[in-house]
Amino acid sequence: MLSFLSARQSGLEDPLRLRRAQSTRRVLGLELNKDRDVERIHGSGVNTLDIEPVEGRYMLSGGSDGVVVLYDLENASRQPHYTCKAVCSVGRSHPDVHKYSVETVQWYPHDTGMFTSSSFDKTLKVWDTNTLQAADVFNFEETVYSHHMSPAATKHCLVAVGTRGPKVQLCDLKSGSCSHILQGHRQEILAVSWSPRHDYILATASADSRVKLWDVRRASGCLLTLDQHNGKKSQAAESANTAHNGKVNGLCFTSDGLHLLTIGTDNRMRLWNSSSGDNTLVNYGKVCNDSRKGLQFAVSCGCSSEFVFVPHGSTIAVYAVHSGERLAMLKGHYKSVDCCVFQPNFQELYSGSRDCNILAWVPPSYEPVPDDDDEAPAKSQLNPAFADAWSSSDEDG
């Protein structure tokens, strides 16, 4: 650390390199924060979490009880032990509450004045954060599994929606209607994700074992169908042009948008080149996944090397994205974890589980440990680097 600081001060190193190195060190030390609680509001499992990208202060959660909760993550009390309080919630008594399980919540990427939620009640709702009223409601014929707004788009306000049907629907927030439909999958759409690098590139994952990349401006179908065999002849004809050997229920782009991570019920996670569609063949080993619906996992941002956080039963597995090495298992929940979200400003992780709890995972604090001996002289508390090195031995000798 001192060498990084010295090199930055003298102009030999890019300041960003020091920041990335420190962020990496903090992520590798993530542990359950025993001094921070998240207020328990949900009466059943927590399915989805999202932290707004503007300040990184407010977090949304959606549960199997249909409730949506907004939390303030900032420690306003300045006390070592504190609870992240729920600012407000769309509870069971709210007139616009979802009737069934909420599967996805997401903040509007550009400010905190609006957020969205989708549910098994076949609706996507757009909320005014200030009034906590539904500003718009999109109704579908099928159960909604997933939705996503582009974090990078500046020329459109499209929300991609995956339902129990095989068609991906694009809803336009400006017009308040479904603008068009993407056809190509054969079964339900379990996960959708816009590229953080390109405005119009969308990835979709389905129970038909396929992952497709789309340019939504094109009318001629998808750009790519990801093939786990990279075009080589497979042993079974039915596995041709499939990303996994089971349902694909999780998608996540890396922060730079150059790669795409997918997870399937075949207990495998794969890393793809998002430009060419090639399987990079990184081996993550067995990644347990028994979820029958979408699984929300997260990728780090701002580190020297990227990390991915994947729900793994009642734990969260931490992998190095490009090497496949499993670095840690975060243990704290009592039941299966269904979602996690990364907070890049402070390198923190939040996870939601079927045990109804939301847990905070934070880097370790490196505060000095006080000396147990109260009678020890004050100079023993000094850092040796700052101690006086003068000695009278020369005069005595």
From Swiss-Prot:
Phenotype on disruption: Ercc8 deficient mice develop normally, but show a loss of retinal photoreceptors after 4 months of age, and enhanced UV-sensitivity.
GO MF entries: ubiquitin-like ligase-substrate adaptor activity
Biochemical pathway: Protein modification; protein ubiquitination
Residue stretches of each WD repeat: 41-81, 97-137, 184-224, 243-282, 332-371
Predominant place of localization: nucleus
Subunit structure: Part of the CSA complex (also named DCX(ERCC8) complex), a DCX E3 ubiquitin-protein ligase complex containing ERCC8, RBX1, DDB1 and CUL4A; the CSA complex interacts with RNA polymerase II; upon UV irradiation it interacts with the COP9 signalosome and preferentially with the hyperphosphorylated form of RNA polymerase II. Interacts with ERCC6/CSB (via CIM motif); promoting recruitment to lesion-stalled RNA polymerase II (Pol II). Interacts with KIAA1530/UVSSA. Interacts with a subunit of RNA polymerase II TFIIH.
Protein name: DNA excision repair protein ERCC-8
Organism: Mus musculus
